[in-house]
A protein has these predicted regions:
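Flexible loop/hinge segments that line or gate small-molecule binding clefts
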Residues: 1-33, 114, 140-155
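Residues that mark the start of a beta-strand
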Residues: 4, 45, 106-107
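Conserved beta-strand scaffold positions in the cores of enzyme catalytic domains, especially
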Residues: 7, 20-22, 48, 81, ...
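Hydrophobic beta-strand scaffold residues
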Residues: 7-8, 76, 130
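Hydrophobic alpha-helical segments within soluble ligand-binding/sensing domains
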Residues: 23-48, 63, 88-97, 116, ...
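An alpha-beta-alpha
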Residues: 32-72, 185-198
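Short beta-strand elements in bilobed, periplasmic/extracellular small-molecule ligand-binding domains
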Residues: 48, 66-92
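Flexible loop/turn connectors
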Residues: 96-97, 101-200
Length: 200
C-alpha cells in the first residue's frame, strides 16, 4: 500500500491483484450448504434475499446458491434472487416480492438475521408460519445483540463469529508488525450450519 503500513482486512475483494492480509468467511460454501440443505428437505423453489449485488460477500453467496441449484438440476428465474441493503425493511419488502411471484418460494436463504426478521414479518402479514409454510435459513454473525441462543434456535443459520474473525485479524496484524517482510496471509473460515425451527 502507498503508506507502507501493515493492515488486515475482514473480508476480501475479487477486484484486486495486490496481495494483502485478510480474514473471511467461506461465503460461497456457506450458502451452497444452506441451499443444499433446503433441497434435501424437499424444496425446489428457493429464493435468495442477499446483500448489495456489488459486495464481494454477496457475490460469493449468490455463487453458492446458484451452484447448489445447478448441481441439483433446478432452474429458477432471476426474480428469485434479490439484492439490497441488509435491513429489516428490505428483508420485508423483498420477501413480499417473492411471495407475490406466480410460484412463490417454499424456502428462502438470506444474508443476515436482521433481514430474516423482515422476512418473518412479511410471513406474518400473509398469515404464513415461519418453518411450516416457508422455511428460512439466514447467515448469523454471532453478534451478542442478535444472538439466537434459545435451546432450539428460531433460525436455521450458517453461523460464523465476528469476534473470532476479529481475534484472527489482530493476530495477523501483530505478525505483520513484527515481521514487515512476511508474505501476506489469507484465512478462510468455514461457517457452522446450525439447525433451528425455521426449516422443515
Amino acid at each position: 500500500n502507498n503508506l507502507n503500513l501493515p493492515f488486515v482486512v475482514h473480508g476480501r475483494s475479487s477486484n484486486t491483484v495486490e496481495k494483502y492480509n485478510w480474514v473471511d468467511v467461506n461465503n460461497e460454501r456457506s450458502f451452497f450448504r444452506a441451499t443444499q440443505l433446503l433441497i434435501e428437505l424437499g424444496h425446489t423453489t428457493i429464493g435468495l434475499i442477499n446483500g448489495l449485488a456489488d459486495m464481494d460477500f454477496a457475490m460469493r453467496r449468490a455463487q453458492g446458491y446458484r451452484r447448489a441449484l445447478k448441481e441439483n438440476n433446478i432452474e429458477l428465474a432471476d426474480a428469485y434472487l434479490t439484492h439490497g441493503e441488509m435491513t429489516e425493511p428490505n428483508g420485508y419488502k423483498n420477501a413480499l416480492a417473492l411471495l407475490d411471484l406466480p410460484t412463490p418460494p417454499t424456502a428462502v436463504v438470506t444474508s443476515s438475521i436482521i433481514m430474516a426478521n423482515g422476512i418473518r414479518r412479511a410471513l406474518d402479514d400473509r398469515e404464513l408460519k415461519l418453518g411450516r409454510d416457508v422455511s428460512v435459513i439466514t447467515h448469523d454473525d454471532d453478534l451478542s445483540y442478535f444472538r439466537d441462543a434459545a435451546a432450539v434456535p428460531v433460525y436455521t443459520a450458517t453461523r460464523s463469529s465476528v469476534r473470532e474473525a476479529g481475534r484472527l485479524s489482530a493476530d495477523l496484524l501483530l505478525k505483520a508488525i513484527a515481521d514487515p517482510g512476511r508474505d501476506p496471509e489469507g484465512i478462510l473460515l468455514d461457517a457452522e450450519l446450525i439447525l433451528g425451527s425455521s426449516t422443515k
